[in-house]
């Protein structure tokens, strides 16, 4: 199977729907991944990279269906890790004399993985070119530590396609190949996760290397990555994002770290989060546990204990959250929250006007209509009668039917 990328460029890679761990177990690939290999058919036929070693046989068989292997004139290896060059041994067994173009560091890596120093290696450096006929050339650009010492990119003149290696990719498997064909929200979330996990340690190298590449003043109509989608619609948008992420990027976001045995500390953390959101609604508050589980961390079983914060303690937590939001704001706060007195003024609508507070009969958690439950999108000022039927007690996760009117407020 192959997919036309542009003109005489075909994708001949492999989709991996089932992979869930990458680089050990530290990077969870919940949407799988792909290993992108490209076949360029001009006067000279060029293969850009292979696929992961576990797909070696399928890859070579698929390639054989596209072209007589003996007609492959050059192999370009942008990166020597097994998810890029893993099928080399299987392929070179069929065409052992085919020239391989790569960096000097890549030769060491390839020999370390495949143990064939007799292969026909050709070292390339930044600015070196390879004529492939029909007026087209490959231009090589070394990109050490983005993200490996042997890394490089390859640019195809005429078609203006940049084969970018690991840069600008995502571990994102989809039946579609191009960026304009997939869900944009999910795509950019996966791009950011990929940058955070693969390239963040090398951020200080990203900006100068991208600047160097842009300095060649080469048009870029497409960016063909080693993993994930090919960027054909506004391809430089991902380049602009990389420059942004590399420049000490931070969002107006606060993460609350907490651990809890019986959900009491969680109640306090939620109250702090409520205070933050009251003061600066633009700030996103993430619960770390879900992110850690997404990253592959295991959570231990909890141990129940007695201590629970009362309403006064929770209000102290909310005020603490408000103060955090005021001190850490990256931009001027919305006018409606500048004066924290507004919080008290808006509570001119008294609890009595909103109806009684409700108490969970199982865990004793109290729903206060004046405060709502922002973590379930129940806004402050929502009477119990208007709370959605799918509401769950934040502490014991039981439904509305276990709630009774607070005894002290019962008529």
From Swiss-Prot:
Location of this chain's protein in the cell: Cytoplasm
Sections of the chain in a coiled coil: none
Residues reported in the UniProt entry to bind Fe cation 3: 360, 363, 393, 396
Record keywords: Cytoplasm, Electron transport, Iron, Metal-binding, Oxidoreductase, Transport
Positions bound to Fe cation 1: 79, 81, 147, 166
Renumbered residue ranges of the record's region Zinc metallo-hydrolase: 30-210
InterPro entries, alphabetized: Anaer_NO_rdtase_flvorubredoxin (IPR023957), Flavoprotein-like_sf (IPR029039), Metallo-B-lactamas (IPR001279), ODP_dom (IPR045761), RibonucZ/Hydroxyglut_hydro (IPR036866), Rubredoxin-like_dom (IPR024934), Rubredoxin_dom (IPR024935)
GO molecular function: electron transfer activity; iron ion binding; nitric oxide reductase activity
Residues the record lists as binding Fe cation 2: 83, 166, 227
Cofactor-binding details, from the entry: Binds 3 Fe cations per monomer.
Cofactor: Fe cation
Major location (coarse): cytoplasm
Entry-linked CDD domains: flavodiiron_proteins_MBL-fold, rubredoxin
Annotated metabolic or biological route of this protein: Nitrogen metabolism; nitric oxide reduction
Family: In the N-terminal section; belongs to the zinc metallo-hydrolase group 3 family.
Quaternary structure annotation from Swiss-Prot or TrEMBL: Homotetramer.
Cross-referenced PANTHER family: ANAEROBIC NITRIC OXIDE REDUCTASE FLAVORUBREDOXIN
Protein's recorded name: Anaerobic nitric oxide reductase flavorubredoxin homolog
Species this chain originates from: Escherichia coli O157:H7
Lineage summary: Bacteria, Pseudomonadati, Pseudomonadota, Gammaproteobacteria, Enterobacterales
Gene name of this polypeptide: norV
């Amino acid at each position: 199977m192959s997919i036309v990328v542009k003109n005489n460029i075909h994708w001949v890679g492999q989709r991996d729907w089932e992979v869930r761990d990458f680089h050990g177990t530290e990077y969870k690939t919940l949407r799988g991944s792909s290993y992108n290999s490209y076949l360029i058919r001009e006067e000279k036929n060029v293969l850009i990279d292979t696929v992961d070693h576990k797909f070696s046989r399928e890859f070579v068989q698929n390639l054989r269906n596209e072209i007589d292997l003996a007609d492959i004139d050059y192999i370009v290896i942008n990166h020597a890790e097994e998810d890029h060059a893993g099928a080399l041994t299987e392929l070179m067994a069929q065409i052992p004399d085919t020239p391989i173009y790569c960096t000097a560091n890549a030769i060491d890596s390839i020999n370390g993985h495949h143990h064939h120093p007799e292969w026909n290696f050709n070292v390339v450096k930044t600015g070196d070119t390879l004529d492939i006929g029909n007026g087209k050339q490959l231009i090589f650009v070394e990109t050490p530590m983005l993200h490996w010492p042997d890394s490089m990119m390859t640019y195809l003149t005429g078609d203006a396609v940049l084969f970018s290696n690991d840069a600008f990719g995502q571990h994102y498997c989809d039946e579609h190949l191009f960026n304009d064909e997939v869900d944009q929200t999910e795509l950019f979330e996966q791009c950011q996760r990929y940058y955070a996990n693969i390239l963040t340690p090398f951020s200080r190298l990203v900006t100068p290397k991208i600047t160097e590449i842009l300095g060649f003043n080469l048009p870029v109509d497409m960016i063909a990555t080693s993993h994930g989608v090919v960027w054909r619609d506004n391809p430089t948008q991902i380049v602009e994002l990389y420059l942004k992420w590399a420049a000490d990027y931070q969002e107006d976001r606060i993460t609350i770290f907490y651990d809890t045995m019986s959900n009491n500390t969680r109640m306090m953390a939620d109250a702090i989060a409520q205070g933050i959101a009251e003061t600066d609604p633009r700030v996103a508050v993430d619960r770390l546990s879900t992110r850690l589980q997404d990253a592959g961390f295991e959570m231990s079983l909890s141990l129940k204990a007695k201590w629970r914060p009362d309403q006064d303690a929770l209000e102290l937590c909310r005020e603490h959250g408000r103060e955090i939001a005021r001190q850490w704001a990256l931009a001027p706060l919305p006018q409606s929250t500048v004066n924290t007195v507004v919080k008290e003024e808006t509570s001119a609508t008294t609890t009595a006007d909103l109806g009684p507070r409700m108490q969970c009969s199982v865990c004793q958690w109290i729903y206060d209509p004046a405060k709502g439950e922002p973590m379930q999108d129940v806004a402050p000022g929502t009477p119990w009668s208007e709370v959605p039927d799918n509401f769950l007690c934040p502490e014991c996760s039981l439904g509305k039917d276990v709630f009774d009117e607070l005894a002290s407020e019962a008529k």
